[in-house]
Amino acid sequence: MASLGRRRGVPVNRERGVMAATECYIVHEIYNGENAQEQFEYELEQALEAQYRYIVIEPTRIGDETARWVAVGNCLHKTAVLAGAACLLTPLALPVEYSRYVALPAGALSLACATLYGISWQFDPCCKYQVEYDSQKLSRLPLHTLTSSTPVVLVRRDDVHRKRLHNTIALAALAYCAKKIYELYAV
């Protein structure tokens, strides 16, 4: 596909085997014109949609933006799960007359985070990736071919269970909150 101007990952001999070219894509930091930043973004978007197992991002600006985007998605997911768990477990830990003051806001926060994640991140191809920090896993990648000393490495992970978890907990928190609000105003 070199005729289309796309650069693919380089197969590298390793102790554990050869990494296939379809497993790793490198967004190289090569400035060849005034639209280099748009070219980097386009390459990253193409790599995300092609679902490479590893994506190495050399350009610092795009790498940092992508890492922040992934971190915000992770934060929303964790907040939805933890706030939902707090909503559901607070009635077990606090007296009934006080539990609603913690459980209802926690349930609302869980639902808000799960909804925001569903609207903003669910259909983004970047949500299937996590930033890789494990040096042992990074050593298997062709990082020696890079010009940047601090690339961002994304690894594709299945997020079906993660989405099910935070959606289930958020819906359970919603059901609990709806029940408590009904009890408060029905009496």
Curated annotation (Swiss-Prot):
- Gene Ontology cellular component terms for the protein in this record: mitochondrial inner membrane; mitochondrial outer membrane
Membrane topology, as annotated, equals: Multi-pass membrane protein
Q: Which GO terms describe its biological process?
A: inner mitochondrial membrane organization; mitochondrion organization
- The keyword Nucleus appears for this protein: no
Kindly list the places in or outside the cell where this protein is found, as annotated in its UniProt entry: Mitochondrion inner membrane
Top-level division of the source organism's lineage: Eukaryota
Q: Where are the transmembrane segments?
A: 80-96, 103-119
Per UniProt, the keywords (alphabetical) are:
Membrane, Mitochondrion, Mitochondrion inner membrane, Transmembrane, Transmembrane helix
- Write down the PANTHER family for this protein, in alphabetical order: PROTEIN PM1 (PTHR15099), TRANSMEMBRANE PROTEIN 11, MITOCHONDRIAL (PTHR15099:SF2)
Q: What does this protein do?
A: Plays a role in mitochondrial morphogenesis.
Give the protein family: Belongs to the TMEM11 family.
Identify this protein by name: Transmembrane protein 11, mitochondrial
